[in-house]
Amino acid sequence: MAVGNVAVPETIYPIEGIKLSATAAGVRYKDRDDLVVIEIATDAATAVVTTKNAFCAAPVRVLREHFAKASPRYLVTNTGNANAGTGADGKRRAIDICAALAAKAGVNNNTVLPFSTGVIGEPLNSEAIIAGLDNALANLAPDNWLAAANGIRTTDTIPKLTSKKVNVAGSHYHITGMSKGSGMIRPNMATMLGYVATDANIAADLLQEMLSAINEQSFNRITVDGDTSTNDCCVLIATGAASSDIIDSPEHPHYQPLFDALAEVFIRLAQLIVRDGEGATKFMTVKVTGGKTTQECCDVAYAVAHSPLVKTAFFASDANWGRILAAVGYAGVEDLDTEQVDVYLDEVMICQNGGVAPTYTEEAGKTVMSRPEITIHIDLARGEAIDTVYTCDLSYDYVKINADYRS
């Protein structure tokens, strides 16, 4: 059961220059869409980031090769099978899918980027995907975002979709995005896919820089189970349909408002993944302040967010704050003065100067821990740096979902 506000927005803005479709190809699931195609306008700029897992999936390898050679026109995603751990045959099948779509659409093979998500180590039924391409291409439409968001789901219990309109000095821009992911989530880029499009006119090189920076604030600041997937990919597309005035540097007056709006969309999509974490009952924000560097704040936040002992304590609504201190201690911060560290659960100080806070009571701790959304605030008191990671608790259902995944 997803935690908190996970509703699809009432208004989903179509992005001029983007068309989508979702089709049932029968890759793994019966009676549901599992093949999603996105068509990108010719003049659009596209940026991509991919998993840092060395055992990356075949479609990721093909995607990287194609993206280095041409500007994308089509994105093709299948669910139910990751096409990872499939060797040379898996790569050939990813290439075959791209070639088939390219031939049907009349574009170069390199302009098609493949994406897969699902079970690792099983041969991909590329024939079923290729057979579904005609229907996918025939049903492309600008208002199919919700269908596409449902089509990319695996163990996700909800479609993950957000959309917003941005007004900047009289110019109107739209941003719409979708993501998928529920388990195997600890991006360095998890089984996580994200697709965001805007009608802003942004230079390709700058768009790539923006995506890399925004990704660090969003998809690279979430964890469900600490596992980095073989298939993570995130795409940002700028079609340019809203304006002929190109944003080509951070000094452009529209750059910062657009950057902030895009970051808001990405953070929302990343948080939706955590809120829908496999078996999750609580959404946790781990905020670390007072660090010497952002990196040490990040290290501490991830140590706490990854800890099975911390996560199970939150599932049990048990204010066992010693587990948080232990995680802070093994995060690898050099010369940490533990007698300066303070820890809060929401508004309740549980640890002051490295020991139990004089004002803390078990009753106050239990009250906070019963909430579905909780912020763990750790103040290292050694600098001005800050960082935040989003995670969820670890429940019995997480084990059941993953134990039963292939059955």
Curated annotation (Swiss-Prot):
Pathway assigned to this chain's UniProt record: Amino-acid biosynthesis; L-arginine biosynthesis; L-ornithine and N-acetyl-L-glutamate from L-glutamate and N(2)-acetyl-L-ornithine (cyclic): step 1/1; Amino-acid biosynthesis; L-arginine biosynthesis; N(2)-acetyl-L-ornithine from L-glutamate: step 1/4
InterPro entries: Arg_biosynth_ArgJ, ArgJ-like_dom_sf, ArgJ_beta_C
Gene3D superfamilies associated with the record: ArgJ beta chain, C-terminal domain, L-amino peptidase D-ALA esterase/amidase
Enzymatic reactions: N(2)-acetyl-L-ornithine + L-glutamate = N-acetyl-L-glutamate + L-ornithine; L-glutamate + acetyl-CoA = N-acetyl-L-glutamate + CoA + H(+)
Enzyme class: transferase
Binding site for substrate: 154, 180, 191, 278, 402, 407
Record keywords, A-Z: Acyltransferase, Amino-acid biosynthesis, Arginine biosynthesis, Autocatalytic cleavage, Cytoplasm, Multifunctional enzyme, Transferase
EC number: 2.3.1.35, 2.3.1.1
GO biological process: L-arginine biosynthetic process; ornithine biosynthetic process
Cleavage (site feature) positions: 190-191
Entries under SUPFAM superfamilies matching the protein: DmpA/ArgJ-like
Active site as annotated: 191 (nucleophile)
A Gene Ontology molecular function term of the record: L-glutamate N-acetyltransferase activity
UniProt similarity note: Belongs to the ArgJ family.
Role played: Catalyzes two activities which are involved in the cyclic version of arginine biosynthesis: the synthesis of N-acetylglutamate from glutamate and acetyl-CoA as the acetyl donor, and of ornithine by transacetylation between N(2)-acetylornithine and glutamate.
Subunit structure: Heterotetramer of two alpha and two beta chains.
PANTHER family: ARGININE BIOSYNTHESIS BIFUNCTIONAL PROTEIN ARGJ, ARGININE BIOSYNTHESIS BIFUNCTIONAL PROTEIN ARGJ, MITOCHONDRIAL
HAMAP family in the record: ArgJ (MF_01106)
Record's protein name: Arginine biosynthesis bifunctional protein ArgJ
Species for this entry: Psychrobacter arcticus (strain DSM 17307 / VKM B-2377 / 273-4)
Lineage: Bacteria, Pseudomonadati, Pseudomonadota, Gammaproteobacteria, Moraxellales
